[in-house]
Amino acid sequence: MTNIRKTHPLLKIINSSFVDLPAPSSLSSWWNFGSLLGVCLAVQILTGLFLAMHYTSDTATAFNSVTHICRDVNYGWLLRYLHANGASMFFICLYLHVGRGLYYGSYTYSETWNVGILLLFAVMATAFMGYVLPWGQMSFWGATVITNLLSAIPYIGTDLVQWIWGGFSVDKATLTRFFAFHFLLPFIVAALVMVHLLFLHETGSNNPTGIPSDPDMIPFHPYYTIKDILGFLIMLTALSALVLFSPDLLGDPDNYIPANPLNTPPHIKPEWYFLFAYAILRSIPNKLGGVLALVMSILILALAPILHMSKQRSMMFRPLSQCLFWLLVAVLFTLTWIGGQPVEHPYIIIGQTASVLYFLIILVLMPATSIMENYLLKW
């Protein structure tokens, strides 16, 4: 008798995706982050759903409703901090997942890669709108500053900003619509994840060597299921430690002050996971130029398949490209640090140097190094 998991219309889809899926035998721990992102999304949707049961999206009561969740709802504090720090874990896994894709040349699966970029934008939009909901000082001013960037778009900019605000400033209408979109977007993200996996399973996974692994495949279950479960345990332990020992470590103390349109915080800055892009935005004195650089700092990932000049797919056997890759990582850490600093000397010039280096490495140095490595292969 044939196993039901191979014949049932629904179970056979799950079976071909998670059980009998042929996978390369050499996948390292860098391939764990896809499944970790799935767990992060599940945690965020579940905690978010329970938070939404107690939250009110009204300027008069939003801040107090979050306080009520933390003080009066059973384990409300746990839900709130799991959700807030879960977002940080989500972005840590996201950036590591993207970094893995860049290092091992996974971007050559262009459909999977492009859906991944769409996912990154969708998650960033979701996180930004979620940050506005507690209606603290940094929520309000962050929303004001970031939405105001759209006014740099020629001709339609001002109208567009007022249309998004639902008025002439960030107010009740803005908060209500941000809550609506923040609730909706994770489900769109979940749908995009399905498309991402669909495209991935069309080609099969890449592997650390970048060499086709068709002759040497193993079933996903039990080898990679047990490996993924170990990853889940490590990540959930880290998240639990963060939530239970220092839940406010990654947050901004200004967000414990209720939003006040008449009082601007001394340093307006987004959550830590947007600081690198914020630093690139601030490094350009022109408003429109800054906005374009901000968008391009993420959209540049879409150029990765075009900029790939090497005859080898992975960086595993390309030491010069490896050096550049880790220099890029160092530049990103520098940008993240600068994004959290005030706009004054020497931070301005450091930020501008790091921003130039960021684009220079990706657009010029990496392709040039790849071409040079191709010549070295002939020797």
From Swiss-Prot:
Database matches in InterPro entries: Cyt_b/b6_C (IPR005798), Cyt_b/b6_C_sf (IPR036150), Cyt_b/b6_N (IPR005797), Cytb/b6-like_sf (IPR027387), Cytochrome_b (IPR030689), Cytochrome_b_C_euk/bac (IPR048260), Cytochrome_b_N_euk/bac (IPR048259), Di-haem_cyt_TM (IPR016174)
Family annotation (Pfam families): Cytochrom_B_C, Cytochrome_B
Compartment(s) where it occurs, according to its Swiss-Prot or TrEMBL record: Mitochondrion inner membrane
UniProt keyword annotations, A-Z: Electron transport, Heme, Iron, Membrane, Metal-binding, Mitochondrion, Mitochondrion inner membrane, Respiratory chain, Transmembrane, Transmembrane helix, Transport, Ubiquinone
SUPFAM superfamilies hit by this protein: a domain/subunit of cytochrome bc1 complex (Ubiquinol-cytochrome c reductase), Transmembrane di-heme cytochromes
Keyword Transmembrane helix: yes
Any single biological process term in GO: mitochondrial electron transport, ubiquinol to cytochrome c
Binding site for a ubiquinone: H201
Residues annotated as transmembrane: 33-53, 77-98, 113-133, 178-198, 226-246, 288-308, 320-340, 347-367
Gene Ontology CC: mitochondrial inner membrane; respiratory chain complex III
Topology of the protein relative to the lipid bilayer: Multi-pass membrane protein
Positions that bind heme b b562: H83, H182
Location, primary (coarse class): mitochondrion
GO MF annotation terms: metal ion binding; ubiquinol-cytochrome-c reductase activity
Cofactor-binding details, from the entry: Binds 2 heme b groups non-covalently.
Residues binding heme b b566, per UniProt: H97, H196
Keyword Nucleotide-binding: no
Signal peptide annotation: none
Cofactor(s) this protein cannot do without: heme b
CDD domains, per the entry: cytochrome_b_C (cd00290), Cytochrome_b_N (cd00284)
Subunit structure as annotated in this protein's UniProt entry: The cytochrome bc1 complex contains 11 subunits: 3 respiratory subunits (MT-CYB, CYC1 and UQCRFS1), 2 core proteins (UQCRC1 and UQCRC2) and 6 low-molecular weight proteins (UQCRH/QCR6, UQCRB/QCR7, UQCRQ/QCR8, UQCR10/QCR9, UQCR11/QCR10 and a cleavage product of UQCRFS1). This cytochrome bc1 complex then forms a dimer.
Additional facts recorded: Heme 1 (or BL or b562) is low-potential and absorbs at about 562 nm, and heme 2 (or BH or b566) is high-potential and absorbs at about 566 nm.
Family listed: Belongs to the cytochrome b family.
Biological role: Component of the ubiquinol-cytochrome c reductase complex (complex III or cytochrome b-c1 complex) that is part of the mitochondrial respiratory chain. The b-c1 complex mediates electron transfer from ubiquinol to cytochrome c. Contributes to the generation of a proton gradient across the mitochondrial membrane that is then used for ATP synthesis.
Name of this chain's protein: Cytochrome b
Protein's organism: Chiroderma doriae
Gene this protein is translated from: MT-CYB
